[in-house]
Amino acid sequence: MSSSPSTQQFKQRLDEHHQWPCTYMFKFIVPLQQTQKILDLFESRDELHTRPSRYGRYMSVTARCTVSSSDEVVAVYQAAAQVQGVISL
């Protein structure tokens, strides 16, 4: 599977700013009904925090976990993109 130019640029920037393995923070905003799908991406990860929005329609999900490469970071974002309504921050 080939990566898009924007994915390649993102991976290059990650490699320039991180030494692997390292702790990386993922942050998502997701409709409340889809929260578990995002949580499932991080079931064996180091640290996971959730916080509901003011009116309870959305959930903020923050995960800090050890990743071994920019490819692993991109894979998480690509998996999260499959969740309907997710916003990756």
Residue ranges of each PLM-predicted region?
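Long, contiguous binding/interaction regions
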Residues: 1-60, 66-89
